[in-house]
Amino acid sequence: CHVDDIYRLAVFGNHSPTMFPDLENTIVNGKNAYESINDHSWVEKEFLPKIQQRGAEIIEARGASSASSAARAACDTVKAVEHPTRSGDVFNAAIMSDGSYGIPAGIFSGFPLLSDGSGNIEIVRDYNLSEFAKSKIAITANELLEEKDLVKDLI
């Protein structure tokens, strides 16, 4: 599998242990990623925690900040906004929520997005989410609300 074979992968939330990479709407090699994995328990108990802890693992392995990863993500986001999203795909970035997917309006969260290539982006709203996915998104949304509350005196 090559990265170009992956479509519609969205990560909801923030770069933290509560972020939620949605496999239920992800397409790999033309097939639904979640349905292609026979062991859904593995997804929930091993894959998701591994992804959620990846940032901490990188910091531990490097013995330093993951600032270079953040810089790369920023560059990738600028490129995604400057070019039209490929047909049938999305790109992922954190933007201010409008209430989509149960993430309260006014907080920044990762969403599946489309770009027209002229700097205009929009949230893709056609993802069907299971109760499991909704519960994971609620956890990350609550974390973001708590973080917003912690800095409310600064904004």
At which residue positions do the language-model features occur?
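C-terminal substrate-binding/catalytic lobe of Rossmann-fold NAD(P)-dependent dehydrogenases
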Residues: C1-I155
